[in-house]
Amino acid sequence: MARDLLFEIGTEEMPAGLIGKIRSDLKDLAINTLEDKRLDFKECKVFSTPRRLVLFVKELAEKQEEKREVVKGPARSIAFEDDGTPTRAAKGFSRAQGVEVDDLIIKDDYVYVEKIEQGQDTAGLLKDILPGLINKLPLPRSMRWADYNFKFIRPIRWLLALFGEEIISFSMAGVQSGAYTRGHRFLVKDRLEVKDPDHYFDVMEKGYIIVDHNKRRELILKQIREIEKEIGKVMVEDDLLTEVVDLVEYPTAFYGKFDRSYLELPDDVLITSMAEHQRYFPVIDEDGSLSPYFVGVRDGIEDYIEEVRYGNEMVLRARLADARFFFEEDLKVSIEERQKELEEIVFQEDLGSMMDKVKRLKQLVIQIGKSLNLKESQLQSLIRAAELSKNDLVTEMVNEFTKLQGVMGREYALINGEDEEVATAIYEQYLPRYSGDRLPQTLYGRILSIADKIDNITSHFSLGMIPSGSQDPFALRRQANGIVNIIIDAQLPLKLSSLLNWSIEVLEPGDKDFVNEEKSFLLQRLETILDERGIRYDIINSVVRVGDDDPNNILSRAEAVMSLRKENPDLFVDLIQGLVRARNLASKGEGNNDINPEYFECREEKELYDIYRKIKDEIQRQFKKKNYLSGLKKLVDVKEPVDNFLDNVVVMVEDERIKNNRLALLQEISNLVSGVMNISEIALDD
């Protein structure tokens, strides 16, 4: 028999940006807990609104499965005499297991006991399971309230717990569980009784609550599509939509209007004012330009929607008026004055001002630009972009709208007559801003972004501010990922070690003990990105710390090894095994010995040497041209000669000349891939 389980945690309003993760974690925790308790169920779902987390388990078994455990004891010959009389060993084993000697089972000449743990009633178990879910739920942040020694994302105000029609009774943080929930906080005053889990959703609908976040999302989109028939295309950005869904319990979309004169402001200013500050969706005309409309979503029904529209229009009008004021004030300040203001902003304690950072960026972009063979005119543009890169940090607009850093730098640069390439680089220096964000698309933007990020990383490492575990307050991992992704995306021939060395040169730290740790950190981020691209872990390990540390070179080598393995896994493993055996033997040699064909005695070593001479130059030529797969495929030619040599030739003979000659040959064979991969890192058993 089975019943449905309904568990609702009613709270004060939770932060919308955290609800999705909490919902996912609650589902995982519930599933794992029920499975650990041996409770069968058909389906587990978790819903949420700003004021509730809802766990709904379909067809949860009324009783645990019984647990059977077989415990192995002493050998039969030790447990029993020849006549079957139990020994002290048998009695001790049975006593330790809580059974009688007669309950012992003899199988395969050993004594066993089968222990059966009867399943408990689910209703009784739930009295501990449900409060346990609250206590164990991982939360990004939590709070205490009243005088309870208990923390949760927000204060708990009610608990609904039903197993079928049975109330699961428990108390937590001064709240007693029961069969009651609450409807919309502004539309329903009285608490609502729920008879059973199936009854819950009807009760919620009558209480103006759409519990299912997916249905709220669909409803908002449907309402927006209706509004679009009147005002034009609505810009629905997915992250904003997700946030709005988690801000409301009963969504009703509406549109409003603002004065067309505000369209003179940069689009990003308008969009930020609407989306970031008011959670409105912008609207665009047929030509893709912003129109003087917005779409908002209220938490409630359509009653008094005109008053709601008017109120929101007034709020946005004030916000846009402020933005226009800040914009106009910023235009009154010259570039030279901005530069002076940067001297007053501390970049990082012990690392000088933001102006000091700008000076470092100017030096870094020169180093990077020269390594990429840029022309003098290009270098001058890069220097100009670096010089202006932080000016917008001291503007009124960025002070009010922090997410517009870079955006306003670009806008003000264009207004001041700077080249578009320079202005775009100022904006692109901050890309990517988060995982999955777009990368810089211009050469100057890529270089400035790399320079800014490597300077940030080296600066913080020099002060001992190094990411550890989940702690990364300065987002250094994200910035390192950005460097690697930019280099790979644009196929820039840049080595991570070069970037590190250049950043150290311009920073001039007193102590350089952090250098190796920072290099390892950068390589670890490269490893993460290779893993995200589907490269096997062992192949990543085999290529990352071999050869130069140009991410493109490393990626090319990794992909070549992956391709070779994928084409013929068995042949690949056999080849690597042979090369590893050759290298292991070669490591027993002392010093560097040249190969002398006159010392060959066996057909197998002559054949191996002949094939080595035949393919060596071609392999090196392909590797030099970075045609790694072609070079590795050529390496397959040595597989059979290597196997024949290792199977039939004794290497460690008494004659030192012959022994060293054979070791030298094996060393040369194993060196064929030394600049491409470390063969010892390849896993041969999976």
Swiss-Prot record:
EC number of this enzyme: 6.1.1.14
A GO CC term attached to the entry: cytosol
EC main group: ligase
Keywords: Aminoacyl-tRNA synthetase, ATP-binding, Cytoplasm, Ligase, Nucleotide-binding, Protein biosynthesis
GO MF, any single term: arginine-tRNA ligase activity
SUPFAM superfamilies: HD-domain/PDEase-like
Alphabetical list of NCBIfam families matching this protein: glyS
Family note: Belongs to the class-II aminoacyl-tRNA synthetase family.
Quaternary organization: Tetramer of two alpha and two beta subunits.
The protein, known as: Glycine--tRNA ligase beta subunit
Gene: glyS
